[in-house]
Amino acid sequence: MIPLSEMMINLKEDASSNYGDIINRQNKILGNMLGSEIDFLIKGIDNKTRAVAASRKDAMLKKRQIFYLPDANGVSRVCEGRIVQARVLAVAEKTARVEIFGVEYSISARDLSYDWMGDATDSYHVGDQILVRITHVSVTSVSDITVKADVKSVIGNASAENLKKCKVQGKYIGTVTDIHKGTVFIRLSIGVNAVAHSCYDSRLPGKKDEVSFVVTRIDSERNVAVGLISRIVKQNI
């Protein structure tokens, strides 16, 4: 048994926050973590009830001491530029929350992959162990450590190479990953990011729709194919 207070779910409080709100938010975060792998230290054992009391907080602080604080030579195990393993704690549509040796960080979809990603839950799952590259570390004390990381720099970017497969006036099948201010963002099946500013189908495209895309221009600087949606092949209903 691990008390909520020992799960080290730290939320920023403001003047409008109250105790009930904080508890509800913490419970929601815990719900999203179901199935994740965590560390804990045993604090006590009740032989009568065969219950064990434990603390995730103590385990995370211990890992922070080992991996983030400088050793006798003044070197930290986790530093900027290093590739390390992280645990996926929770996944939402546009973000994945990971634990990196006792420190939690939410990686946005744009840092998960160079490929446009409509839904991170399609590629990442609670309990996964992934490689991330540390992009920033700030250590004030063992209880005050912030870290930033990405996944895309580890897996690499094949967009430029895949873009060579695209031809102007070529037709390709793709999936709508996002729509913003009338612009439709598409991930083509040939591994290319594409942008459509118009749709010739009488129906409006929606996220996760499968569409037929016609290339009108290739933007080599941004590694993006520009064009239009000729028709919606399959709607995501």
Where are the language model's segments positioned?
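Single-stranded RNA-binding regions, centering on S1/OB-family and related RNA-binding modules
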Residues: 1-237
